[in-house]
Amino acid sequence: MINPNPKRSDEPVFWGLFGAGGMWSAIVAPVIILLVAILLPLGLFPGEALGYERVLAFASSFIGRVFIFLMIVLPLWLGLHRIHHAMHDLKIHVPNGKWVFYGLATILTVVTLVAIVTI
């Protein structure tokens, strides 16, 4: 018999943020690390393309702020979700682990949002 009042789960929201963080960390973050940490210092990427004025102008624009926000927040959700489930798999039971890890991710997301808005 089908339960007429099924219990709703909040897990799809967290899995969505986890999945988005995983895709971002796999596709976008390596490109940025390659550009900023390898190609630019070796002189294989024109330095004036990432000059201070251009980077500041990009970071001050709406698209730049969204990019920086996503560059910080999505990997953060990925990492905290992985830590939460790793603790569960290792049978290290954190009291109210869901509140601890997802609450920390939410707090850090709000802190990042405030920081990005006030740039």
From Swiss-Prot:
InterPro entries: Fumarate_red_D, SQR/QFR_C/D. It is a multi-pass membrane protein. It is found in: Cell inner membrane. It comes from the Bacteria. The chain crosses the membrane at residues 26-46, 58-78, 99-119. GO terms for biological process: fumarate metabolic process. GO terms for cellular component: fumarate reductase complex; plasma membrane. HAMAP family: Fumarate_red_D. Belongs to the FrdD family. Part of an enzyme complex containing four subunits: a flavoprotein (FrdA), an iron-sulfur protein (FrdB), and two hydrophobic anchor proteins (FrdC and FrdD). This is Fumarate reductase subunit D.
